[in-house]
Amino acid sequence: MAKKVTAVIKLALQAGKANPAPPVGPALGQHGVNIMMFCKEYNARTQDKAGFVIPVEISVYEDRSFTFITKTPPASVLITKAAKIEKGSGESAKGNVGSINRAQLEEIAKTKLPDLNCTSVESAMRIIEGTARNMGVSISD
């Protein structure tokens, strides 16, 4: 018989830098999960993606064991890295803080495709383009 899931926890953590301090400790501690075991596994699985924020979905079971799935970095993080900017514009309609080209947009779309609710790279590119526009990043050809 399959183990019963008691909780699903979603966190966004720096790749390779998870530690028992907040937000990891309190989120996992209240469900009785071994925090250090999670931190070691997460850091080992994400060490090659250093510098990115990696979302993780942790399933906690009745016997206090857990499994987790790492997702792709948020589109906004990938866009800021590609545009070489610190952060997006506070007022996207007024300010243009940077730009990325179509090749960079396609690369980001291919990276995000497994986590997006679409099947083609073209539709993923439109989703990422909308995110970039809302951040004040323009798309150049």
Curated annotation (Swiss-Prot):
A GO term for molecular function: large ribosomal subunit rRNA binding
Designated name of the protein: Large ribosomal subunit protein uL11
A GO BP entry: translation
Matching NCBIfam families: L11_bact
Quaternary context: Part of the ribosomal stalk of the 50S ribosomal subunit. Interacts with L10 and the large rRNA to form the base of the stalk. L10 forms an elongated spine to which L12 dimers bind in a sequential fashion forming a multimeric L10(L12)X complex.
Disulfide partners: none
Biological function: Forms part of the ribosomal stalk which helps the ribosome interact with GTP-bound translation factors.
PTM info: One or more lysine residues are methylated.
Name of the gene this protein is made from: rplK
PANTHER family linked: 60S RIBOSOMAL PROTEIN L12, LARGE RIBOSOMAL SUBUNIT PROTEIN UL11M
